[in-house]
Every structure is written in structure tokens, then in C-alpha cells.
Amino acid sequence: MAKQSKNRVKLNKQYKSIGKIPVSALKKISEFMDLPALARDIRSSENNMVKHNHRHIDELEEQLKQLGITKEGYAEFVAKNYNQIRLGNKPLSLILAVLLENINHIAAVHLHYDKRENFWLVTTVHAIKPRNLEKIPLIWKR
């Protein structure tokens, strides 16, 4: 058992906490998936984002460089400013989106719930077109 505890501490060090999901949103999310009541923490890891979906990141990274923003900074911006939560395309996954007026693309991050560690992990960062976002089921809105 002690060995498992050491692994957990080591695992958590690689993730940075970048936001929280409101309790009101968790109530809505629980209508779509079975989650513990305290599954609010959103965490990020550069290695994890690259591992899960390098195509989106490569496309976005050049644009972000021009703006002087890192991938991690982009994920953190979305995690702190999202105004919609949509259902992800995989089990236990969500999309956080920042919708602003008069914009052609929407800042978005994909999250996956880690049951073992009880947090939401950013798996992908990207910009999505409004018409594509509208096709994804809306769970919660500010």
C-alpha cells in the first residue's frame, strides 16, 4: 500500500491545477455521467496534451506563438473563463468553451475525468468553429 501512495504523490506533481468546475455545473454533468460530488478540480500537463492530440496542438501552437501565448497558458485561460460545458465525444469527457461575441473561432479544451485521482485532466486544446460547437450537446452555461 505504501508503494501505491508514493506513486500517487509522484503522479500529482506532474499536473498543475488550473481551475474548478462549479457545483451547479457538476449537478448538470451528473445527469450525463456517474461522478463523485467533489470532482471539481481541472488540471493540466503539457506532456498529457501532446500525448493525446498533437494534431490540434500543432495547428494551434503557431497561432499562439504569434500572440505570445503558450499551450499551457491557453488551457489555463479557458479553464478560468469558460462559459459553456458541453458533452465530450468519449466516456467521462467534457468540452469547456469560451464564447465571445463577434468571433470566428471559440477557445476550447477537452477534459477527461481521471477516476483514480478524482480530477478533470486537459487532454486537448484547440479553437473550434461556432457551427461545429453547436452540434455538441450543451450541458451547462453561465
Each predicted region: which residue ranges?
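Ribonuclease/tRNase effector modules and their secretory precursors
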Residues: 1-142
